[in-house]
A protein has these predicted regions:
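Short gly/ser-rich loop at a beta-strand->alpha-helix junction or flexible surface loop bordering the NTP-binding
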Residues: 138-213
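Nucleic-acid nuclease catalytic cores
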Residues: 9-30
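Short alpha-helical segments that sit at the start of domains
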Residues: 45-69
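Short, small-residue-biased leader/transition segments that mark boundaries at the very start
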Residues: 2-6
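Charged, structured surface patches that assemble and position nucleic-acid processing machinery
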Residues: 30-42
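Loop-centered beta-sheet repeat module
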Residues: 67-131
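Hydrophobic alpha-helical interaction segments
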Residues: 196-258
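Intrinsically disordered, low-complexity basic tails/linkers immediately adjacent to helix-turn-helix/homeobox/MYB/SANT
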Residues: 60-63, 118-144
Length: 258
């Protein structure tokens, strides 16, 4: 930062960038300032100018985890309903800024699902199956990592069944040797700190498998297992290598009640 000062002349503060707090403070103290190429604020000189720059959404090839969670929530629980940002925020706990970004992502990749009425954006899914089929190419596995763990006496209640264990519960797929459970990434850290399990270096020493998810599986679940859409996405890679898993996923999709 540098200050231009000439005796008996107005002072103009020049800075490459300024925070919102600094700009507000300068405005309150009536200090003239300029951010080259962006803003000029010198009311005593009769000079006020700014360049309005709207940051475009980054072109994405896939939804962010939060946007994916909201889209799946709409597909599973809000079919044929108009959902605005307030409803999304209340259901998910996401901030207004995050919800606005999510609306932008969905509107960019699936514009037919987003409409505007009186300045308010809504998500409305008329044909859930068609929306799912079109959205799949933008959706990713929610699983960030899988851990082989050994239970302790502090094993928590209420974990959602996931992975092959969830597939086996609703299809002809045989149950795996270890149960799989889904946990939101933020909760995983807490449960690990509470010594609910121990991470094992060798799979044969483990009693269970913990899937760490990029969004909260509880948001979308309506039972003891993770939701069917996230389940299919989480097992995509396994389905490519194992025809039994592929057949089980196809069965889950066929049984969906759109």
């Amino acid at each position: 930062q540098r200050q231009m000062c000439i005796r008996d002349r107005p002072v103009l503060w020049c800075a490459d960038k300024m925070t919102a707090y600094e700009r507000r403070s300068f405005n309150q103290q009536r200090i003239a300032y300029v951010i080259p190429g962006k803003q000029l604020n010198a009311p005593l000189l009769g000079l006020l100018a700014s360049r309005a720059v709207q940051s475009p959404y980054v072109l994405r090839e896939a939804f962010s985890p939060s946007a994916q969670a909201v889209l799946l929530w709409c597909l599973l629980k809000k079919k044929h309903d108009s959902v605005d940002s307030t409803m999304i925020g209340e259901a998910t706990g996401y901030s207004r800024i995050t919800v606005n970004r999510i609306m932008g992502e969905i509107g960019m990749l699936l514009p037919e699902l987003v409409s505007v009425h009186k300045g308010i954006k809504f998500i409305r899914i008329h044909e859930a199956k068609a929306a799912w089929m079109k959205a799949r190419k933008f959706l990713e596995s929610p699983v960030k990592r899988r851990y082989d763990v050994q239970r302790t006496v502090n094993w928590p209640e209420g974990l959602l069944v996931a992975g092959e264990s969830a597939l086996a519960a609703t299809t002809a797929l045989a149950e795996p040797g270890k149960f799989s459970w889904a946990v939101f990434a933020e909760r995983y850290k807490i449960l690990l700190k509470d010594e609910c399990w121990r991470e094992m270096a060798y799979a044969e020493q483990a009693t269970d498998v913990i899937e760490v998810w990029s969004y909260d599986p509880v948001l979308l679940s309506s039972g003891r297992s993770v939701d069917p859409l996230s389940l299919m996405l989480s097992m995509r890679r396994e389905a490519e290598m194992d025809p039994r898993v592929e057949a089980a996923i196809e069965h889950v999709e066929e049984e969906l009640k759109w």
